[in-house]
């Protein structure tokens, strides 16, 4: 089904299981600085388990109460066509659209390991939705996260070190991307811990808000 939201064409995001969920790290300079990490010279990415996906309205479940677990607001790319070795200039033709997402992270585990797949792949750690916007420029969008009504993250996708088209191109040189695959483009500064009962809202300019609560 399609919807008209402020004149922008959108599609409902079903409960889908893509072949891949790809997360990109340290893609905003301010977040890299707050993490104490050097700026990447090329996109830093890893795979998240597709079973970590939940929709708008779903509940985030923290597996270890004693661990610090953080919210991370992100713009998500939804792939529309099979891609292999596409150039940045051609990348837009292979993108179905964009939606709001979170890359929830068990920071305690992340800080104890050199790989990030485990700390970000727990069930419910990738909220996505509620709709995919199919006609929107991804390069200059305000991105915000509100925790219980308080603004915690506030940036713009123009601050991405590697923009959406560059990411699609780079990742496609390393692996084939298939329709429905999701790329999380990175989070800006302001990440912080979540607690049971929290209401988290990701607002990205031109996209429907993504709202989830913490169980």
Language model: regions and residue ranges:
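Catalytic-pocket segment enriched in acidic/His residues
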Residues: 31, 37-39, 107-215
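Short, structured patches in soluble enzyme cores that scaffold and shape functional sites
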Residues: 48, 73-75, 79-81, 99-104, ...
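Short Gly/Pro-enriched turn/cap motifs at secondary-structure boundaries
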Residues: 3, 65-69, 119-123
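Residue "hotspots" at secondary-structure boundaries inside conserved domains
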Residues: 14, 20, 67-69, 169, ...
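Extended, compositionally biased flexible segments
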Residues: 12-64
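N-terminal accessory regions of nucleic-acid-interacting proteins
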Residues: 84-98
